Regions:
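Short amphipathic helix-loop junctions that connect adjacent transmembrane helices
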Residues: 30-47, 235-252
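Paired small-residue
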Residues: 91, 102-110, 295, 306-314
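Pair of pore-lining "gating" transmembrane helices in MFS-fold secondary transporters
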Residues: 5-33, 37, 211-231, 313
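Structural signature of the two symmetry-related core transmembrane helices
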Residues: 79-94, 173, 283-298, 378
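Residue-level signature of mid-helix packing/kink "hotspots" within the transmembrane helices
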Residues: 58-66, 116, 149-150, 262-270, ...
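Conserved MFS/SLC helix-loop-helix module at the cytosolic interface between two early adjacent transmembrane helices
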Residues: 62-95, 99, 276-282
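Juxtamembrane intracellular "pre-TM" segments in multi-pass secondary transporters
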Residues: 1-7, 188-218, 403-404
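Cytoplasmic helix-loop-helix junction between adjacent transmembrane helices
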Residues: 107-145, 328-329
Length: 404
């Protein structure tokens, strides 16, 4: 019965992750254009406002995630899924009717408070799937949010063309309302709450694990992963404009090149998760960081669009393995009663990585050039590669999270 429950939940949560990430990424490409309709802003002002509006979500998320993790260990993962999907639906609706940028900024801050559908999906699946299949399960789930991330901008552009900006935000709100209903009706959780007296603080929670140093290292690697992932995409179009001889189709080409890592991730994440279960998640994490480093180094020098595109596609295979393997290592080293809190702390480091990556991308590329930006990404990958061996876990110390 437990086997049937976690597999069914995986299917529902895969769809929920796809819709959730899709709804979020639908907003990304049209937000700067929407802001232009709300006032007489210059290009630089729009760029600054866009950066602030996107960054506030991650900053709030970084602060609030540990609180939600503590609550999830007391109330269960399902209430957190409903909180996140319902909250995002409300935020999309608020943006759709926003009369000015201040309301949009507030909506995005609220989104940071109620975010976490994908992270709680990962935490639920990690707690329900057998330890021997955690990599496969998390890898499969990763294809859902990656597919949403991949298709969202394309769908957003089409919807905005036919329904306008506000209509697109309304559709995103309807998508998240659908996810809320599906999660409410179909997701099952046999939850055994942790008594409030047994809920520890952050330091005590980490010390209570068998290998807290491994968990802390995974947190740092997670931040580095998110920083590298978010450093490149914001500058893709400007970078390509430098190396293309005919930039007339720049928007289309930029979209296609940006999608290549996502395509590779969707194609390979499930299989790579299986390899991690078979040969060890630390090995998979190390190889993924090594491949990422090798594929980023030539991007410092490449000026040919075809070679650059191939390298971006190959980078996607690295991305496909990184977060699932890191999350599987967390699962193996965390007592199931603390899993919600540990995953929420990891979510905080993900959010910090997102902010750091965006800042890295904009500042370094603006003052030192695009080649220097790729060099900094390589340095971050190398730091992760050096840390990866320290996540190795003695098999006898693994914590089985599927005992429920």
């Amino acid at each position: 019965m437990k086997e049937k429950v976690w597999r069914r939940n995986l299917i529902i949560l895969w769809f929920g992750a796809f819709m959730s990430e899709g709804a979020i990424s639908i907003i990304v490409p049209i937000m700067p254009l929407f802001l232009r309709t709300l006032g007489n802003y210059s290009g630089k002002e729009v760029n600054l406002l866009t950066g602030l509006i996107f960054s506030i979500t991650f900053l709030v998320k970084a602060v609030i995630s540990p609180l939600w993790g503590k609550i999830s260990d007391q109330k269960g993962h399902k209430p957190m899924l409903l909180k996140a999907s319902g909250g995002l639906a409300f935020c999309c609706l608020l943006i759709a009717v926003a009369p000015n940028i201040l309301i949009i900024f507030i909506a995005r801050a609220i989104q940071g408070v109620f975010s976490g559908y994908i992270n709680n999906s990962e935490s639920m699946i990690a707690s329900q799937a057998p330890a021997s299949k955690s990599g496969l399960a998390l890898g499969t789930l990763a294809t859902g949010d990656t597919a949403g991330l991949l298709l969202g901008p394309i769908i957003g552009g089409v919807l905005a063309t036919f329904f306008g900006f506000r209509g697109t935000f309304l559709i995103a709100a309807l998508l998240m309302a659908t996810v809320f209903i599906l999660s409410l009706v179909l997701v099952k959780e046999d939850f055994h709450p942790v008594p409030k007296k047994s809920v520890l603080g952050i330091v005590e929670t980490l010390r209570a694990q068998k290998l807290p140093q491994v968990i802390i290292i995974v947190f740092i690697i997670t931040m580095l992963i998110q920083a590298t992932n978010n450093a490149v995409n914001p500058i893709i179009s400007m970078y390509l404009s430098k190396i293309l001889h005919n930039p007339s189709n720049l928007t289309l080409i930029s979209g296609l090149v940006s999608a290549l890592p996502g395509i590779a991730t969707v194609l390979s994440a499930t299989y790579l998760g299986h390899l991690g279960d078979r040969f060890g998640q630390t090995k998979l994490l190390g190889w993924a960081l090594f491949i990422g480093t090798i594929t980023y180094i030539p991007q410092i020098f490449i000026t040919n669009i075809w070679i650059f595109s191939i390298l971006r596609f190959l980078t996607g295979f690295s991305i496909a393995a990184l977060l699932p393997s890191a999350q599987a290592i967390l699962t193996q080293n965390t007592d199931h009663k603390s899993l919600g809190r540990i995953f929420s702390y990891n979510q905080t480091f993900q959010a910090l990585g997102n902010v750091f990556g965006m800042m890295l991308s904009s500042i370094v590329s603006a003052y030192l050039g695009y080649a220097s930006m790729f060099l900094f990404v390589v340095i971050l990958e190398l730091i992760g590669l050096l840390l990866a061996p320290f996540t190795r876990t003695n098999k006898h110390l693994k914590v089985k999270t599927s005992s429920r």
